[in-house]
Amino acid sequence: ERGLRFLLKESVQAPRMGVGFNGRYDVRDWGHIEALETLLRMQQLDRVPTDLETPVKNLITTLIKTLEENEIKGGGWNYSRSRRGASPASPFMTAPAVLALFRARELGYDIDTGIIERALDTIENARLESGAVQYSTNPERATGEGFEALEGACARMAVSELALSLGGRSSLDRVRFSVKSFFDHWKWLERRRAQTGTHNPPFYIAPYYFFYGHLHVARAIELLPKEEQEKARLQLLKLLWQVRDPEGTWNDRVFPRSACYGTAMTLLALKSPATPLPAEFKPVEIKKPLPKPKEENEKAENEKAEKSEPVSL
């Protein structure tokens, strides 16, 4: 409950966590996304104390509005933007945001479906022929190398395909390939775990994507056929236990404090089989009224003409 009260107090507290974007690098929307997902899951689990139900609902509405207001022109979200003009979306930030909005919509919150559609567009446009997903959506400048090689993209492919799949824009084969790519190229993630620097060559993998990737591949596994899930879960479990610290925590950075983040992401990954995915996104179809029969139209026209004729006195 103490953690919940902290979220209620700080999640959108200005200026540090308010609406907007400061400078070129602003990670506040990561906090908004994770706070939204956390509160929605607490509602689903019926874990919100009675006296906090209204504040939680109000904060969820505010977080949704904040994400909507922070949308990049053209769709999606990114924590790194240009000061000189339009910026591309970040698929690995946009996908978790979309998943949280899917869950909010499932629970009855009002969501602008246009924002979801635009976000899905940016993820889909970042998908390359190889199955890799660009670091930032820019299909006109795709190279398929470095960031965009399967090795460089393997930690964001699963979350991208998961969001696209629930949005009706992916397939089982694509999801399966994203999970396979994570395992096939895991060694490149491990080489960057708990290392200095950020986007170092050859594949420019930053250390802090390590446990992020494990969490979202765990979620994507839930879309696989039942007979494939158990094998994939065991494979993931072995990898997670392989990188567990002697203290019993998980950390993908060089800072002791980040063990909190790594451990939390790992625990969420381990709980994925018991955590329902958001409901599939189905845009509300606005049905146009059926045309009136010909005789009704003629009758209406005649009545209209009669009313418009001048009255003789």
Region spans (language model):
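The feature captures the short pre-catalytic strand/loop hairpin that immediately precedes
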Residues: D245-P246
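TPR/TPR-like (Sel1-like) alpha-helical repeat modules
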Residues: L240-W241
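An alpha-helical repeat/solenoid feature that recognizes helix-turn-helix modules
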Residues: E1, V12-E117, N125-Q235, T249-P283, ...
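Active-site neighborhood of glycoside hydrolase catalytic domains
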Residues: T122
